C-alpha cells in the first residue's frame, strides 16, 4: 500500500457537462438554424447524417506535447501504448496500424494496456498463486517429500506405549489432584460454617446475659427507690407539723400551753396547792 498523493481540490459549477447552452432553444443560433430548415437531432453539415453534437475538447493539465508520454514510454523500452495521452490518440494509433497492415498487433497492445490500467488501478488486486516448492513435491507420486529420519517400527511402538502410559499416569494424577482439591474445599466450607455458628451462639449468650444483668440492676434500683420512699413517708407522718407563721401564732401557742397544763394532773395540783 503506497503513500497517498497530494490532494487536489476540484470545484464543480452549476453546469459541469456544459450542456445548458446546447439545450437552450431560445438562443439566436438555434432559432436561425430552425428557420433555415434544421431540426433538433439532425446533422450540422451539408448531409443529414453528419455530427449531431458539438466538438468535445478534453482539459490538458500539463505542458507536454502530443504523444510525449508515448515517446517517453518507448524510450524506457516498454514499447507499448497507453491510454493516458490526449483523447483520440488510441484511435490514431489504430488507424496507423491499419494502414501499415498491423491492425491486430496494435489492437492487442492497446487492449493489454487497457486491461493493465484496470488491474493496476484503484480497484485492481494482484493474487499470488499458492503453490508448493519444487524441492518438497514429488511429481510422479504426487506427494510431499519428507526429509525426517525414518524410525524403526519397534522404536515407534515403544515410544507410543510410553506416551500412552504417560498419558494414563497424567490422567490419574489429575483426577487425584481434583479430588484432593474438592475435599479441601468442602472441609474449608464446613469449618467456616462451624465458626459462623459458634460466633452466633456466643453472641446470643452474651446478649441474654446482658439483658439479665440489666433486669437485675433495674429491680435493685426499684427496690431501693421504694424503700427510701416509705421511710420518707413515715418520717413525715411522725414529725410535728411546722408552726404556721401568722398573726395568731402567739395566741395559738398560749392556748396550747394552757390546754397542756389543764391536761396534766400534776400541774393542776400545783396550781390549786393540793398535796397528796
UniProtKB/Swiss-Prot annotation:
Residues 229-239 have a biased composition (Polar residues). PROSITE patterns: G_PATCH. It is found in: Nucleus, Nucleolus. It comes from Candida albicans (strain SC5314 / ATCC MYA-2876). GO terms for cellular component: nucleolus. Residues 152-172, 219-228 have a biased composition (Basic and acidic residues). Involved in rRNA-processing at A0, A1 and A2 sites and negatively regulates telomerase. This is Protein PXR1. The gene is PXR1. Residues 25-71 form the G-patch domain. Its main location: nucleus. One of its GO terms (biological process) is rRNA processing. It comes from the Eukaryota. Keywords: Nucleus, Ribosome biogenesis, rRNA processing. Residues 1-23, 152-261 are annotated as: Disordered. Residues 173-218 have a biased composition (Basic residues). Coiled coil: none annotated.
Amino acid at each position: 500500500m503506497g503513500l497517498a498523493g497530494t490532494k487536489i481540490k476540484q470545484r464543480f459549477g452549476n453546469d459541469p457537462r456544459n450542456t445548458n447552452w446546447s439545450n437552450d432553444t431560445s438562443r439566436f443560433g438555434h432559432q436561425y438554424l430552425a428557420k433555415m430548415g434544421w431540426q433538433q437531432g439532425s446533422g450540422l453539415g451539408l448531409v443529414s447524417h453528419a455530427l449531431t453534437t458539438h466538438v468535445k475538447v478534453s482539459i490538458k493539465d500539463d505542458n507536454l506535447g502530443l504523444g510525449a508520454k508515448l515517446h517517453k514510454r518507448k524510450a524506457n523500452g516498454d514499447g507499448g501504448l497507453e491510454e493516458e495521452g490526449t483523447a483520440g490518440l488510441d484511435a490514431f494509433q489504430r488507424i496507423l496500424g491499419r494502414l501499415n497492415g498491423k491492425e491486430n498487433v496494435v489492437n492487442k497492445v492497446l487492449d493489454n494496456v487497457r486491461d493493465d490500467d484496470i488491474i493496476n488501478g484503484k480497484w485492481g488486486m494482484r493474487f499470488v498463486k499458492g503453490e508448493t516448492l519444487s524441492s518438497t513435491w514429488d511429481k510422479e507420486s504426487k506427494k510431499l517429500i519428507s526429509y525426517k529420519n525414518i524410525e524403526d517400527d519397534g522404536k515407534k511402538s515403544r515410544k507410543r506405549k510410553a506416551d500412552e502410559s504417560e498419558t494414563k499416569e497424567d490422567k490419574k494424577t489429575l483426577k487425584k489432584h481434583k479430588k484432593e482439591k474438592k475435599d479441601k474445599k468442602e472441609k474449608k466450607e464446613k469449618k467456616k460454617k462451624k465458626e459462623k455458628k459458634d460466633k452466633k451462639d456466643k453472641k446470643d449468650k452474651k446478649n441474654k446475659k446482658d439483658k439479665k444483668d440489666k433486669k437485675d440492676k433495674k429491680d435493685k434500683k426499684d427496690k431501693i427507690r421504694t424503700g427510701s420512699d416509705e421511710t420518707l413517708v413515715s418520717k413525715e407522718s411522725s414529725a410535728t407539723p411546722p408552726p404556721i407563721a401568722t398573726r395568731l401564732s402567739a395566741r395559738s401557742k398560749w392556748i396550747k400551753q394552757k390546754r397542756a397544763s389543764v391536761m396534766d394532773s400534776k400541774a393542776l395540783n400545783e396550781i390549786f396547792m393540793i398535796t397528796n
